[in-house]
């Protein structure tokens, strides 16, 4: 089954919370591209991972360092299994076959989506493991993990644990798998957001009616200027070539283009399959050193 990547339609970071996390506001979309993962119970009760690394060459070693070929104790799947088993010793062991395409440090939720796939599997095997307990556990593992437990798209606030499912029109896009490594903690620190109590937040916890309508109707060009990613100025200052890439996405026919997460991956949404194919070919011709993939949602 697919362990899908996510993209962010807009990512606002209004302030840093007193608990050390940053408050976020973003629309999270699951896309059709991602990792392939197969999980089965292991009779010996242990954790086994067998992975095939298909991440772009420049970032391939980042995954291998935490795979079964490196230090497995730093792998999010292993951490998820150990944490779940500590709460529910009755859980079975697992044997996981993973084709890894989503790179670390890409803003696509590659670790979080795998963790959610494993939690959903364990939940199906453990009748006394309630959905509320799974959600709490997911939030402890990673801020993006709760989103991947669901099936749909969501407006996400808090540190990532407050989810409001939303309706989004079917659409297509192109994803650029870029080689730049963006350390999430470093990117947040570079934003230099003011410290503030979460309780003092008075607005911004809901999408405007205008944005809800745009998302339902799939008018992606109307998102430009209405949804933005606060990490883009920092990312483009560190890596000006990413700003050039965004300009070309828009020049070549993308209706809306943005960095996803804290970077470094970038995507463009298009109006229809014909424009999607034309955009893909022009980007591949302009940036022959980069990897581009089609996706839909």
From Swiss-Prot:
Q: What is this protein called?
A: 4-diphosphocytidyl-2-C-methyl-D-erythritol kinase
What role does this protein play?
Catalyzes the phosphorylation of the position 2 hydroxy group of 4-diphosphocytidyl-2C-methyl-D-erythritol.
A biological process (GO) of this protein is:
terpenoid biosynthetic process
The record ties this protein, via PANTHER family, to: 4-DIPHOSPHOCYTIDYL-2-C-METHYL-D-ERYTHRITOL KINASE, CHLOROPLASTIC
Q: Which UniProt keywords apply?
A: ATP-binding, Isoprene biosynthesis, Kinase, Nucleotide-binding, Transferase
Q: What top-level class of enzyme does the UniProt entry assign? A: transferase
Q: Which residues form a coiled coil?
A: none
Q: In which pathway does it act?
A: Isoprenoid biosynthesis; isopentenyl diphosphate biosynthesis via DXP pathway; isopentenyl diphosphate from 1-deoxy-D-xylulose 5-phosphate: step 3/6
Which InterPro entries is this protein grouped with? GHMP_kinase_C_dom (IPR013750), GHMP_kinase_C_sf (IPR036554), GHMP_kinase_N_dom (IPR006204), IspE (IPR004424), Ribosomal_Su5_D2-typ_SF (IPR020568), Ribsml_uS5_D2-typ_fold_subgr (IPR014721)
Record family assignment: Belongs to the GHMP kinase family. IspE subfamily.
Q: What is its EC number?
A: 2.7.1.148
* MF terms (GO), sorted A to Z: 4-(cytidine 5'-diphospho)-2-C-methyl-D-erythritol kinase activity; ATP binding
SUPFAM superfamilies documented for this protein:
GHMP Kinase, C-terminal domain, Ribosomal protein S5 domain 2-like
Give the catalysed reaction(s), semicolon-separated: 4-CDP-2-C-methyl-D-erythritol + ATP = 4-CDP-2-C-methyl-D-erythritol 2-phosphate + ADP + H(+)
The entry's active site is 6, 144
